[in-house]
């Protein structure tokens, strides 16, 4: 097998080699059963065991309290932009949203289709380079919920604190930083995360929802989008994304073997410190994000001369450093350094960046 490249894609993102090797070994014959997980009935005892173990491992990793349901759903995080208000926003109610970038803005735009949305705070006055402190927020009394994105993958902003909303349920899009460090699940009413960054392959979204928030869906809510229906049917009201669920379970096993989210926090801190440290010491590369809002997972950076961007990307590709091009809406470069990428990937990137700077700086 040729050497594996370092994949810095924002999503679908790198998966651990050990997980892919395990899936490869089990592809044609899962544990002597003579068939692939792809071919299993989702109602079979074997597949139900796979699904239940994946859920339990995720519960263990995040210390999910017993009064929360863990759902493995379809449609990705973007479908949750509609599913959340359909389940949690009464027709005459108001939901508060915090806008810190493109993904939280998309959530706001979708929620407005279903009811009243109050944008309680926005990072726009800071040019999306910093997150407004909660003392700047204009929260609605008795809001149905407060929604925010803990990490903006495109802009590279991340909350390093959890908003305090009292009795109002806190809803968070953790698509790009879930499992990257410990969290207190009990601080949230609902957590959702598209799988294709830190959980597994695309086609799946994980929802962790407090039980008291179930059963309030609008009468017009499609059955497939009703959290209570999903919870009552073990996320199997219809055929789930079985292989994505299975692969996510392998990732959870790998995370536990690595020492859990506590070990991931140490690993991720070392990676982001190395990369941001190099950028800050350089006179050729820049990252403009406020230091206390810098993402641990998605590191955008620019070259001193954007005319060199194509040469930089070509050289990176030639060295097996893939998918470093920034999002089309912001340009520049972006290195996504999720759990599956180790420090050696960041060291390889920094080495190339130093070499390129020496040649072109």
From Swiss-Prot:
Its cofactor is pyridoxal 5'-phosphate. It is found in: Cytoplasm. Signal peptide: none annotated. Pyridoxal 5'-phosphate binds at residues 77-78, 103, 153, 173, 196, 238-239. GO terms for cellular component: cytoplasm. Binds 1 pyridoxal phosphate per subunit. It catalyses: O-phospho-L-serine + 2-oxoglutarate = 3-phosphooxypyruvate + L-glutamate; 4-(phosphooxy)-L-threonine + 2-oxoglutarate = (R)-3-hydroxy-2-oxo-4-phosphooxybutanoate + L-glutamate. This is Phosphoserine aminotransferase. It comes from Pseudomonas putida (strain ATCC 47054 / DSM 6125 / CFBP 8728 / NCIMB 11950 / KT2440). The lineage of its organism: Bacteria, Pseudomonadati, Pseudomonadota, Gammaproteobacteria, Pseudomonadales. The gene is serC.
